């Protein structure tokens, strides 16, 4: 049974790593996209900071959804400023138990290109040819290892 609680006036589900989200300011981003009626629209939305997001996605990896591994890979691969800038975001909390636990889980799930993490990423991307699958698995492994080595 999922339990929720009221936090700052919002009913929120409890999630492993969710408490870390309150140690980082929410980020505001601008999203521009085409609506179903064809008009281009812009919205400014608040999103959780990257460190708690990665911690929560890592905690969720045991639920058997390939998207969790893909989301981690995507954030690392596309973080503005690269993996070094992303690693700097972890600096204030790198010694917290929850971060150490997340690193341990990432290390086990992404221990090689043949482990569950890279395989889940390739599966989620629904790639057809073996060469593309192997390239993505290798890139996933290398991206996660690069972050792990810098935290």
Predicted regions and their residues:
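Compositionally biased terminal segments of proteins
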Residues: 1-151
């Amino acid at each position: 049974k999922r339990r929720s609680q009221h936090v700052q006036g919002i009913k929120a589900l409890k999630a492993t790593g969710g408490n870390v989200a309150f140690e980082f300011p929410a980020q505001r981003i601008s999203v521009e996209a085409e609506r179903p009626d064809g008009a281009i629209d812009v919205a400014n939305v608040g999103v959780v900071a990257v460190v708690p997001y990665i911690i929560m996605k890592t905690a969720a990896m045991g639920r058997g959804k390939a998207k969790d591994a893909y989301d981690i890979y995507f954030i690392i691969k596309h973080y503005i400023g690269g993996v070094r800038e992303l690693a700097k975001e972890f600096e204030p909390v790198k010694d917290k138990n929850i971060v150490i636990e997340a690193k341990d889980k990432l290390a086990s799930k992404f221990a090689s290109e043949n482990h569950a993490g890279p395989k889940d990423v390739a599966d989620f991307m629904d790639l057809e040819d073996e060469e593309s699958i192997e390239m993505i698995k290798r890139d996933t492994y290398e991206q996660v290892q690069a972050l792990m080595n810098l935290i």
